């Protein structure tokens, strides 16, 4: 299981600059027939905020309906302590009733319509299809959107990919500078970058960078491979997004 904030660094920049000389001429995979994929789609941000009042029954039902995500969301994404269903329902109600969280949710609803989320799921399914074409298996079965309270942009597990929509509200969103995110980072916090971040996040979940091996060249090679993987999985992606 992996959690990712949005990462943009000098190693990726330099390695991708070296790759750009052939990228436009040699984008792989563009003409292959799509492989069939089977996925479920969960707009958990809508599920969570649609309840008038969160009850223990909601907690039990969500835990049973979404076993691949609910406990992960509660314990790892919004960091609520372990509790019984009654106490957890109370904690979740406090979360969705918090003024700041309500403001974030309102902005998410403004930026992302339900149709926008469907389009996002479709784009990720193309990535999964390309992955299956190249590597023979479909990596995950569940695609999820959620509100993370600015904790995570992308999460991956052995069965799911999730997107924290509140990390993609646009570079003009006033929330980001107010919580100390630097401008060079939040200038990429828009929906245009979601698919790229999902693919890069998945690559990082399968290929950890060696933290003990901090040589400049080694990291350039790592991020160059990540760039190439992303270009294979999304051959139509604009270079400005790939290198962002």
Region roles according to the model:
Residues 25-94:
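N-terminal mature-domain "stem" immediately C-terminal to a signal peptide or N-terminal signal-anchor/transmembrane
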Residues 93-244:
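Acidic/His-rich structured neighborhood in mature extracellular/periplasmic domains
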